């Protein structure tokens, strides 16, 4: 594998690969199970903490309609109904499920 660095010389820098996805079981109001999260550098315990206690990511979750590049898009909503940010950025469940 080549280094993602744009320099023309052979780079000694390592190619960084995310760890293989682990199956997470997180039940949220009976919604379902989280199978894949596109941020491999967040610890699963920290994700659970963010869902429970961080109001920045919202107390409710809105699942929007699919688009060509993201079959499922999950965003956090705060208690006033405003979209406050993406819950763990984009959680792309369908792409993972249909790629299998």
Curated annotation (Swiss-Prot):
It is found in: Cytoplasm. It catalyses: D-glyceraldehyde 3-phosphate + phosphate + NAD(+) = (2R)-3-phospho-glyceroyl phosphate + NADH + H(+). InterPro entries: GlycerAld/Erythrose_P_DH (IPR020831), GlycerAld_3-P_DH_NAD(P)-bd (IPR020828), NAD(P)-bd_dom_sf (IPR036291). GO terms for cellular component: cytosol. NAD(+) binds at residues 39, 64. D-glyceraldehyde 3-phosphate binds at residue 89. It comes from the Eukaryota. GO terms for molecular function: glyceraldehyde-3-phosphate dehydrogenase (NAD+) (phosphorylating) activity; NAD binding. Its main location: cytoplasm. Its EC number is 1.2.1.12. Homotetramer. This is Glyceraldehyde-3-phosphate dehydrogenase, testis-specific. It comes from Mesocricetus auratus.
